[in-house]
Structure formats: structure tokens, C-alpha cells
Amino acid sequence: MVLKASGLTKRFHEGPIDLTVLHGVDLQVHAGETLAIVGASGSGKSTLLHLMGGLDAPTSGQVELMGQTLSALSAAEQGNLRNLHLGFVYQFHHLLPEFSALDNVAMPLWIRRQTPAQSAQTATNMLAIVGLKDRIHHRPSELSGGERQRVAIARALVTQPACVLADEPTGNLDRSTADGVFELMLQLARDFGTAFVLVTHDETLATRCGRRFGLVSGRLSEWG
């Protein structure tokens, strides 16, 4: 098992307001599977993804990544584990505008202290896999929306993580481009054996994943 959430509850306190966003969520993610979490805006989808990625701490419950309980680790240990085993894709690509596609994809490898030559070769190969071999020296402003998301996917996969967490990865794309980007993620999951957890409000796209869950008022249930 790659990722496991047990009894995740998240509450926010703002003055007199006590808001429970997630109620005792349980979820298991296995190697190589594609899993969609569908819900309306404000249902807690992004909060759940942040908790599972170790980007925030639950009020109660726990998350296990590759068999290790995140709450039992120091912040530095959590960061190292996350960098080794997780990739992230967001609705907004978060590419650095002053860097080329190649440099954006290579950056996680630089953080791992790979040599510039090794990083460039690995990033070039990954960009070719996502269909951008002729665009590696273009900056984000010189790429289309779909191309920018492909760069973001390449960046998430370049370290060969066990799981990619994707938060509305096609939310800013038109239907045709969204279909292409979504199919690319499914194909890469098959090719690399990487698990993908995709948060989306789009039920049509979600039906193409191996497992589907609905999140309503902070409660998660699996669809048949």
C-alpha cells in the first residue's frame, strides 16, 4: 500500500466559528491505481489532498505514506519522505516563469543534488514522454495551457514517485485539452506503475479512473 488515511478529521476555528471540513475519512491507495475523488467546491477535496500529502496536519486521525505514519516523523523527515514518494499537480501549474520547461522539470532533481547533466537528460526524457520534446527550451509564457499542464505532470513524475496527488489538474482547460491531459495521466499511471489520486468536480472524467469516490459535506464514500 502506497498511501493510507485512517479516520481523518479536520476542524477549523475562527473566533466563534467551529467548522468541521472532514469527518473521519478512511482511504487506501494501492500501487499503480487511479482514483478519483469527486465533490463540489467547498466539499473538502483539496483539504483531504493536503492532509494525504503531508502538507497539513489533521485534527485527528493519521496518514501513512509507504508504511510510515507521518505524525510520528519530524517535519524534516516528513519532507524527505514526501519528496521521495509523492508528486503533486495543481489546477494552476505553478511553473517558474523565468525558467524553461526543461529547467522546471529538472528542478526536483537539482534538489536531490543530481548533476546538471543527469538532471537535464532525465528531464528531457520525461518531457519527450509527455509529448513536448520540441518544446523543452520554451518558457511557460510560450506554451499553451495544455502544454503547461504537461510540463507540470512531467515535473511531478520526474523523480518516479509512488503516487501523484492531482488537485483539479484539468480545471483551467477546455474540454478537448482536458480530455487529452487526463488521458495522459491515466496512460502514465499504467506505464510507470504510479498511483494517481485525482481530485475533480468533473464526474465525466472521474468515470475513467479505476476507483471513484464522492465527497459530500466532508464525508467520503466509494461509488460502485
From Swiss-Prot:
Subcellular location: Cell inner membrane
Any one GO cellular component localisation term in the record: plasma membrane
Residues noted as binding ATP in the record, renumbered to the chain: G39, A40, S41, G42, S43, G44, K45, S46
UniProt record, GO biological process: lipoprotein localization to outer membrane; protein localization to outer membrane
Known EC number: 7.6.2.-
UniProt KW keywords: ATP-binding, Cell inner membrane, Cell membrane, Membrane, Nucleotide-binding, Translocase, Transport
Cross-referenced InterPro entries: AAA+_ATPase, ABC_transporter-like_ATP-bd, ABC_transporter-like_CS, ABC_transpr_LolD-like, LolD_lipo_ATP-bd, MacB-like_ATP-bd, P-loop_NTPase
Domain ABC transporter: 3-224
Subunit structure: The complex is composed of two ATP-binding proteins (LolD) and two transmembrane proteins (LolC and LolE).
The protein, known as: Lipoprotein-releasing system ATP-binding protein LolD
Gene from which the chain derives: lolD
